[in-house]
């Protein structure tokens, strides 16, 4: 599982840095996501449609829900764009709450506090 998640983040990182069109689309989606979050008028399903395809791939694996803070923290050290990672984690949290019907634990909140 560690290798899978690490590989997915590496693919995302490479694409984000190497492909200006992808970066622009991703950044625009994040801006739209933040506008939606600020308005408090939409559901988690509406938020989830802005999630990066990498996130969707990762979240489809049930094991990801069990992923702990230290493993995520280790991955963050490999990712150059910390803001993009934090926003990706934020999107993942929303999807996890929706898909698993669970509240977000303190470790996830601690991760976000560190990078936002």
From Swiss-Prot:
Top-level lineage group: Viruses
Protein name: Uncharacterized protein 441R
Species of origin: Invertebrate iridescent virus 6 (IIV-6)
């Amino acid at each position: 599982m560690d290798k899978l998640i690490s590989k997915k983040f590496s693919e995302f990182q490479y694409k984000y840095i190497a492909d200006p069109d992808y970066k622009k689309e991703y950044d625009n989606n994040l801006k739209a996501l933040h506008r939606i979050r600020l308005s408090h008028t939409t559901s988690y399903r509406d938020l989830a449609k802005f999630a990066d395809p990498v996130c969707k791939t990762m979240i489809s694996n049930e094991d990801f829900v069990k992923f702990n803070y230290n493993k995520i923290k280790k991955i963050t050290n490999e990712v150059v764009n910390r803001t993009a990672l934090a926003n990706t984690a934020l999107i993942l949290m929303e999807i996890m709450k929706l898909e698993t019907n669970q509240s977000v634990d303190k470790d996830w909140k601690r991760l976000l506090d560190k990078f936002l």
